[in-house]
């Protein structure tokens, strides 16, 4: 009954405990060794600087070894993002309950913690926190930190949000262009439209050409023409 009461109290207050207890704060001496690796980057060591991108989720894969003479129960995880140079806490991660996972003396256990990244781009020291129940007390197990740099993701031109913005801008410019053409451009182009040049008709062949003569006789007085014909006859 006592152990059940402890667990109930822990599940109700673990978030508050992790919020008020800084990473460098009170820790309990316990022969319960916890280490971890980044599941997505298993080659990383404590001496390396991890590179993470906002929006992704990293998974801490813990390995816990119980060197106590009594069983130890893993009951929760939390953590903080700390400023590496000053030690100031920048982000407190939401505490989460686990199990409970009972680890017998001399045995080990593997468990995981998912951490969605949504922090300001910067340099951090990630300090995970594991909470256990031992000897009817809740204890905070000391765990190493991991240096990391968090950056914003690269924006692709095929990003749905960017595509939507591009379509909105395109529609806006198209509407503006149509408005300018309708209220100003159309009148301008009408006023400066080129005037087609008039084509002169070619003169019809003269009667002189039709009759085989080199000139037009229509304008010559009839008396003069008769006189010319009389001379030719003579």
From Swiss-Prot:
It is found in: Endoplasmic reticulum membrane. It comes from the Eukaryota. The chain crosses the membrane at residues 163-183. Residues 184-234 are cytoplasmic. It is a single-pass type I membrane protein. Residues 20-162 are lumenal. The keyword Cell division does not apply. Keywords: Endoplasmic reticulum, Membrane, Signal, Transmembrane, Transmembrane helix. The keyword Transmembrane helix applies. Belongs to the IRC22 family. This is Increased recombination centers protein 22. It comes from Scheffersomyces stipitis (strain ATCC 58785 / CBS 6054 / NBRC 10063 / NRRL Y-11545). The gene is IRC22.
């Amino acid at each position: 009954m006592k152990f059940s009461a402890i667990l109930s109290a822990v599940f109700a207050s673990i978030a508050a405990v992790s919020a008020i207890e800084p990473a460098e704060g009170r820790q309990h001496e316990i022969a319960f060794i916890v280490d971890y690796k980044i599941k997505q980057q298993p080659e990383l060591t404590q001496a390396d600087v991890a590179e993470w991108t906002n929006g992704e989720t990293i998974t801490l894969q813990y390995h816990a070894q119980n060197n106590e003479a009594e069983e130890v129960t893993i009951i929760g995880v939390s953590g903080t993002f700390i400023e590496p140079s000053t030690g100031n806490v920048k982000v407190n991660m939401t505490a989460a309950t686990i199990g409970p996972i009972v680890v017998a003396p001399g045995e080990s256990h593997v468990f995981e913690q998912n951490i969605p990244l949504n922090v300001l781009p910067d340099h951090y020291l990630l300090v995970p926190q594991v909470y256990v129940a031992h000897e009817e007390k809740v204890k905070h197990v000391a765990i190493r930190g991991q240096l990391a740099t968090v950056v914003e993701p690269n924006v692709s031109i095929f990003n749905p949000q960017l595509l939507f913005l591009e379509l909105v801008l395109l529609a806006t410019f198209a509407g503006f262009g149509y408005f300018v053409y309708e209220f100003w451009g159309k009148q301008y182009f009408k006023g400066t439209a080129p005037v087609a040049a008039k084509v002169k008709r070619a003169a019809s062949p003269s009667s002189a050409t039709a009759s085989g003569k080199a000139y037009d006789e229509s304008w010559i007085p009839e008396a003069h023409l008769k006189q010319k014909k009389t001379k030719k006859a003579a």
